[in-house]
């Protein structure tokens, strides 16, 4: 889903989304086409051979190993670098997402991945499930969990972030500025395609690989960029309908 993620970052920085207001795909607007061209040109200019098929972990591993100086990712990179190649660990930091213009807001909505914890209404063990969730968020246990990967695991509870027993962790103190950058983005971001609420289209955008195939078509097959974008937009809309999406 790297192709979808990177294109999403670009169009979000331009104030747009990968979905139009009517629920159809947005790959042929001026901002989307500009983003496709930007990432295509960047790939051709600086990417290593074979990287066209990289997944999220492949790109992250290059950063862990000190083979690339940049990645769109989270605070888990702190432990990843420390484990794989410790020499650059004092030189890494999180920065706000790139902006179109210096005058644009530093922190704009882009992307957040959420893992919900729920107690199902139809569950036969609702009481036990609720008790388990309450146990997980017991202050001491929750802080212990957050400290298992400090800087990567970030508190969802505001009062925990103010707890001295949480904030006193050496890694958290060392990377406090970077952690704040990440938390600021988390507070305004949403899942790709869910900027206006849960939509079936969101899963299609990130799981079907259609945007990634579009990049293949442009880079490997030499397809004209606008032609490839129109074809991808058409295929995405067909996939949305097949998945039962509501299109206005």
Identify the role of each PLM range:
Residues 1-25, 31, 68:
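Extracytoplasmic/periplasmic solute-binding protein
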Residues 51-65:
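Short helix-initiation/N-cap motifs at beta->coil->alpha
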Residues 65-74:
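Alpha-to-beta junction loops
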Residues 227-230, 234-248:
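Short, low-complexity disordered leader/linker segments with a strong preference
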Residues 77-88, 100-209, 247:
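C-terminal lobe and pocket-closing loops
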Residues 1, 75-76:
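Short secondary-structure boundary segments
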Residues 22-53, 93, 97:
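Glycine-centered hinge/linker elements that transmit conformational signals in sensory
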Residues 216-230:
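Short, charged, surface-exposed loops that flank catalytic or proteolytic processing sites
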